[in-house]
Structure formats: C-alpha cells, structure tokens
Amino acid sequence: MALRFPRFSQGLAQDPTTRRIWFGIATAHDFESHDDITEERLYQNIFASHFGQLAIIFLWTSGNLFHVAWQGNFEAWVQDPLHVRPIAHAIWDPHFGQPAVEAFTRGGALGPVNIAYSGVYQWWYTIGLRTNGDLYNGALFLLFISAISLIAGWLHLQPKWKPSVSWFKNAESRLNHHLSGLFGVSSLAWTGHLVHVAIPGSRGEYVRWNNFLDVLPHPQGLGPLFTGQWNLYAQNPDSSSHLFGNSQGAGTAILTLLGGFHPQTQSLWLTDIAHHHLAIAFIFLIAGHMYRTNFGIGHSIKNLLEAHIPPGGRLGRGHKGLYDTINNSIHFQLGLALASLGVITSLVAQHMYSLPAYAFIAQDFTTQAALYTHHQYIAGFIMTGAFAHGAIFFIRDYNPEQNEDNVLARMLDHKEAIISHLSWASLFLGFHTLGLYVHNDVMLAFGTPEKQILIEPIFAQWIQSAHGKTSYGFDVLLSSTNGPAFNAGRSIWLPGWLNAINENSNSLFLTIGPGDFLVHHAIALGLHTTTLILVKGALDARGSKLMPDKKDFGYSFPCDGPGRGGTCDISAWDAFYLAVFWMLNTIGWVTFYWHWKHITLWQGNVSQFNESSTYLMGWLRDYLWLNSSQLINGYNPFGMNSLSVWAWMFLFGHLVWATGFMFLISWRGYWQELIETLAWAHERTPLANLIRWRDKPVALSIVQARLVGLAHFSVGYIFTYAAFLIASTSGKFG
C-alpha cells in the first residue's frame, strides 16, 4: 500500500476515518510529535524552515515593489504627494460593467485600480526612491535575496551543512551575533543609507551607484569624525521653510537633534532619524561584545543567572536552574520571542501615527488608520501566541526537580494569588466602567445630560503636561519654563518638541477628557481579562485544583464528560481559545477609540467625540451607525461607486463571522448524525454513488470545531472592521 498522508505519523495514516486528514493538518508543524524525531532533527528542521520564511517575505516585498513599478503611479505621486492618490496595483475583473470600470479608474490610471493604503509610497519616497526604475531594481534585488534564502534553506538540510545541537544551544554566540550582526550592523548600514542616499534625496540630490563615491554627504567629509568635532555634523540643519525633495531651504547637517516635525511633511526630521539609528548601532555593537564565547572574556549567562539570588532569600533560589530550563526548551524561547515581538508591534502601531517617520504619511488619513489597526491586530495575535507556547513549555519541557524553589517554581506555587488578583482587577474594572457608561446612557435617555458622571483624567493630563503640553495649565517639568529639565534641553531638541506637542495638527499627546477616561478603562478591562485567561491557562497547564494531573493529557485535550469531574474548558488550549475572543474584543475597543477620535480631529469637529463618547448609545449611534452610512451606500438605486468593494467586503465579513457560530454553538452528535444521513443518501443516489471515498466521514472533534469556529469569527471580525475603517475614512477624506 502506498504511503498515505500524513507520512510523519504512521499511527494517523492508519486511521480509517476523515480524522486522518484533519489531525494530519493540525500536527503537520508540531515536529516534536512526529515519528522518529530526534532533538537534533527537530532543531535542524526549524532552522531550515526559517530560511523558507525569509524567502517568502523577500518574495512578497519584491512583489509589492514590482507591481507598483508596473501598474502604479509612483513617479506622478512623487511630483505631488498630497493630491495624487497612490495606486497599489491594477484590477482585472471580467465581471466589471461600465459603472464599475468608471468607479475604479482613478489616480490618473487608464483602467480600474486599487488605491494603496499601506504607506509604501511614503516610505519609498522618504528613503530616497524616485523613479519606477528604482522600484524595479529593488524588486530584482529582493528576488535575488529570496532565491539565496531558499538555497540556504536547502543547503542546511544537506548532511554536510546540518548544524549540531551544541551549535543551536550556544546561547552566548547567538546573542553576540544577533545583537552585533542583526541589530548593530544593520542599524549602522541603515544610517549609511540615510546619510548617503535618503538625506541628499530629501534635498533634491539624486545619489545612485554611478555617483555614490563622488557626492559628499557632508561638505567637510570625514574630517570632523577624525578630529573629534562631531558637532559640525549637526550644524546648518534644514530650515523650517525647507521643501522636501528640493534644495529650497535645505541645510547641510546629517546628524541632528532638532526634535519635533518637518513643517511641510509633518514627519520626523530625516537627520534626527539618521542620528537615532547611529546611536542604536553604537549601543548594539557594544552589546554584541558582552558575552563570553571562545575568547574567555565577557559574561557567561549561566553565571549571571545563578548570581541573581535576592538578599534575605525572599525569592528562594532566585534564577538557579533557569539557564538550562530556557536553553533546552524551544517553547520557552519562542514564548519570550513572541512576547517581545508582540509588544514591539503594538509600539509600532502607536509610534507610526504619533511620531510619523515617513514624509507626508501623516496627511494620508486612511493609511494612518489602516496601519494603526493592522499593527494592533497583529500584536494581539502574537501576544496570545506567547502564552500558548508558555503553556506548552509547562506541559512538555518543565522539570520541577531542575527548578526547585527558583523564581519559576515560586510563580507556580503562588499562582492562586496571581490569578485571584487578576480576577479581582478585571471584575472591578468591568463593573465600574460599565456602571458609569450605563448611568450616563440613562441620564441621556431621560433628557438630563447634565447628570452624567464625567471624570477628568487628571493624572494622565499631568503626565502629558510633564512632557510639555501646556493647555491643561499644570506648571510641571517640561511645561514649566523655569525648571532644570526645561533649561537643559532648551538649546537642542526642546523647542522643536514643544512646538510639536502643543500644535493641534498632529497626533502627539492628544487632548483628553471624560470620554477618553471611560474608554481607557474599558480597554484596561479587556487587557486585564485577556491576561487573566492567558496567565491562568499557562499556570494551570500542568495541573489545577480540579485536575492535578494534566501532563499526560497534553496541551489540547477535549471535553471528556463528568467521569473524572469533567474536563471541559480546562485544557491549556481552551484558555488560549477563550483568550483570543477577548483579545479581538479589546483591540476592537482600541481601534474604535483611535479611529473615532481621529476622524473628529481630522474633520475639525472634535466636540462630537467629546460629547458622544461618554455613553454607549453615543458610540453605537455617532461612531458605528453614522460612519457605516458610506458602506451601506456602496450599491444604491443610482448605481455604484468606488466604495462598493468595501460594501461587499463588509457584508461578506459579517457572513464569515456569523458562520463561526455554527461551529461554536453546536453539538457533535448533531453533526455526526447529519453526516451519516448525507453519506447514506449519497450511497443510494444514482450517478452520485459512482464516487466513493476511502475514509469514513466523522464529525469534527470538539477542539477542531472550536478552532474552525474561532478562525471564522476572527477572520470575519477583521474583514468587517477593515472594510468599515477604510470605507468610512476614504469616503470622507478622498
């Protein structure tokens, strides 16, 4: 008999039912569970797959460049970034009638096109690209890098080039190379690109390979570097009347500390950005020389950890045993990496709009909204993944003997206290926030809006004032003109920063009031509840009060009836599954808040947000209902318009989302009976019964159905909001 799918598990391959297919897909990437796996092969497979991942990323970015160069309007956009709409790619659709062709032919294109809301035009423009030829060159280069990555992945699967386990577990060498090589050298290289290509480009000078060695990035060349007069590189910066991409008002400085934004582009000064990357490079190049490898100098991480024993023995044996625990657990390492990456992705969402780095992106409102929402959702999925792999670590890799009385064991010892405190915080936030909102709703409904409970966020306003925002009247730190903090920065970055923070045309430290106070606490409720579910899932992964022996049941055991007191909703997977719903809800509140506040700011009617955001009906009526009118008008009796695709996606998103409930609120027996009936009918229907299948059809398991339901819920939720966000923003601001 030929080998059946899945080849990596002979046990599953023998399964006579359709379970074989679903379980095979589910465990395809769980290398640890495959037949004949060894620790060495596990590490080698993961390592090789990283190169495949890189190849896909480079191919994808190459495709972005290629399609914009081929079908976009980059050169026209460069001439007038504020009024030309950037084109992502052409649309070829045989179903388009004349009205659709007319609706989607825009941005100076000859046929139907998609508008780009990703910010790539602004990014490419800022870093010095100017022509379609530049874009094609970039696409070809990335295609080449993609091919190199694929070859490297294949190479590292060949016996001669397979690294050993000891190589993968050499933590110090890996840290040194990643810190110095990945962050240090790449930041230094990026500084070089900004100084040699992007900054001259912003001043109207076109630097390419043919004149790269002839154009001095700074009139004095490397002289100031070698004579120690580094301040010369900061002298004569671009003036406030500088036109980006033009020599008019341009200076000669390359590394500055101006603070604030370029008045025309509303983005950070390019010379400040170059300075920042140089500083990052310097720090990481040093950091990558700190750990002990073959040369016998520097820190040994194991020694560092074992020296960490708090005084008075208040944390037991401190960090003893942690080095081997972490170094021998891929799931622990992945959990740490995902947690870090999740936080950084959320920070990217925050900083892309509050401190925009790319020229003119701040004036492209739809792109700002899309990028913020995109990065917050990505961050949510990555962060929940961190806890999932933390739970798998406890089940598969945690050894109580190795970690006796250290900080990890003590976390498990007092998990009840951690979980109950989180529970209390979530309940407190939930009841109080909902109570305030509902009280305000009732007051509005009874026509007495003056009886609302409106709380000024004075602590947050004080923090904003400390950073230099003067409108609240707190005379503190940077908003006080006679303090030491103010005087220290007065000659360098402070004037630019204070100008930016007190100007109303950007998103830096937005003015906040009672509506912000309430939604902030609603978001805090979501964050704490999501964290509660995730933390409980990880800390109870090996055993809980109800079921102290979860280790041999694994990560995703299903509901198993009341025999052992019931195992429903107590596997680590169940906690992850529930947490994702909370994560999506929380990010829903975050993005609603961000978007509503910003559209009222951009439209100049910020009082609408301030007045309507203090009660739930305000959110439902003045944000969701009011802004979905464009969507509902994508198709109307007069034909269609360019929002019709978003109107369709809005409907389709709701459909996918609602389909999720068919899998979530259901009984397995019902589906099994339905399947048996369908199979019976099929076998007795002429013609149809010529088609046979080898596997007996069985209903999805409880865990599988939940996964399918969760996937539909998530995808539908995100599709629906993406369509709403893009249509309502682009419908208002063109």
Curated annotation (Swiss-Prot):
Subcellular location: Plastid, Chloroplast thylakoid membrane
Binding site for phylloquinone: 671
GO molecular function: 4 iron, 4 sulfur cluster binding; chlorophyll binding; electron transfer activity; magnesium ion binding; oxidoreductase activity
Keywords associated with the record: 4Fe-4S, Chlorophyll, Chloroplast, Chromophore, Electron transport, Iron, Iron-sulfur, Magnesium, Membrane, Metal-binding, Oxidoreductase, Photosynthesis, Photosystem I, Plastid, Thylakoid, Transmembrane, Transmembrane helix, Transport
Keyword tRNA processing: no
Membrane topology note: Multi-pass membrane protein
GO biological process terms held by the UniProt record: photosynthesis
Residues where chlorophyll a B1 binds: 654
Top enzyme category: oxidoreductase
InterPro entries: PSI_PsaA/B (IPR001280), PSI_PsaA/B_CS (IPR020586), PSI_PsaA/B_sf (IPR036408), PSI_PsaB (IPR006244)
Transmembrane segments: 46-69, 135-158, 175-199, 273-291, 330-353, 369-395, 417-439, 517-535, 575-596, 643-665, 707-727
Binding site for [4Fe-4S] cluster: 559, 568
Catalytic activity: reduced [plastocyanin] + hnu + oxidized [2Fe-2S]-[ferredoxin] = oxidized [plastocyanin] + reduced [2Fe-2S]-[ferredoxin]
GO cellular component, one term: photosystem I
HAMAP family, alphabetized: PSI_PsaB (MF_00482)
Quaternary structure, from the entry: The PsaA/B heterodimer binds the P700 chlorophyll special pair and subsequent electron acceptors. PSI consists of a core antenna complex that captures photons, and an electron transfer chain that converts photonic excitation into a charge separation. The eukaryotic PSI reaction center is composed of at least 11 subunits.
Family according to the record: Belongs to the PsaA/PsaB family.
Protein name, UniProt field: Photosystem I P700 chlorophyll a apoprotein A2
UniProt gene name: psaB
